[in-house]
């Protein structure tokens, strides 16, 4: 595969990272937006565009495995400006440095890397606040995107941003091996997903899954153990039928209010 136009590669389960990708594209002019899930079967991705960005959420102080795997496939021209943006709920650690290192394995790293705080929403771990309680967070996102866009527009080189919390970076370093084990086994955790009887077989979960991990069997979703734990299936279920064990039954669901269901399902723009 060859990328010749200015492009943002994004991965998004709640819509937060997709909102950032849309906002960056709007500020800088029309970028192609490509869902990283659509690149899984590409053996190599040759990047000849003037600018390319990678935007993704932070999971356990790491980039999602799918982002790491696609980053390994990128063969980037020396003339291409490369930026990364990590959306996070408060503990991003050194995730952009990890992306930079991964890209450098193929010769070229990030020219700049930015962190954007977005509403925390891991419904598998805690009860997320509903979107209307995050207005200030969305306002700060707009401000940060303006600053980032100016840097990208001028093609400035800038060190990757890291967590402002020393303890966050310290814990990440101390428990790095344990975190890596958690990440490498995330795909197995989808055995805890199930659907209640109010599932209406609408297939939204099947369509929205970025790694095609869900299919309907006997009119109920089943998970095929390729899960990235992006939580799109549980967050966007219109009937609140999809659950993770029993702990999510009474929890809120979070969907970014600035991103539509169709935008989440689409693979490219």
Predicted regions mapped to residue ranges:
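Residue-level preference for nonpolar/small residues embedded in alpha-helices
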Residues: 17-20, 95, 191, 201, ...
């Amino acid at each position: 595969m060859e990328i010749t136009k200015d492009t943002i590669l994004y991965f998004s389960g709640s819509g937060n990272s997709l909102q950032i990708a849309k906002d960056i594209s709007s500020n800088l002019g029309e970028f192609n937006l490509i869902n990283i899930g659509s690149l899984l079967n590409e053996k190599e991705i040759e990047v000849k565009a003037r600018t390319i960005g990678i935007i993704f959420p932070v999971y356990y102080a790491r980039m999602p495995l799918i982002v790491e795997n696609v980053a390994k496939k990128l063969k980037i021209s020396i003339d291409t400006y490369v930026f990364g943006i990590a959306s996070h709920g408060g503990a991003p650690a050194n995730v952009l440095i990890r992306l930079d290192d991964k890209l450098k394995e193929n010769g070229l790293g990030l020219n700049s890397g930015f962190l954007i705080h977005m509403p925390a929403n891991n419904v598998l771990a805690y009860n997320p606040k509903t979107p209307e309680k995050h207005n200030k967070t969305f306002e700060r996102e707009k401000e940060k995107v303006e600053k980032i866009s100016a840097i990208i527009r001028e093609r400035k080189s800038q060190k990757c941003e890291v967590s402002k919390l020393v303890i966050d970076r310290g814990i990440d370093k101390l428990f790095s091996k344990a975190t890596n084990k958690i990440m490498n086994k995330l795909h197995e955790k989808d055995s805890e997903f199930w659907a209640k009887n109010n599932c209406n077989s609408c297939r939204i979960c099947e369509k929205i899954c970025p790694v095609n991990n869900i299919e309907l069997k006997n009119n109920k979703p089943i998970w095929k153990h390729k899960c990235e734990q992006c939580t799109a299936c549980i967050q966007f279920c219109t009937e609140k039928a999809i659950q993770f064990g029993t702990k999510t039954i009474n929890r809120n669901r979070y969907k970014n209010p600035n991103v539509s269901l169709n935008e989440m399902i689409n693979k490219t723009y």
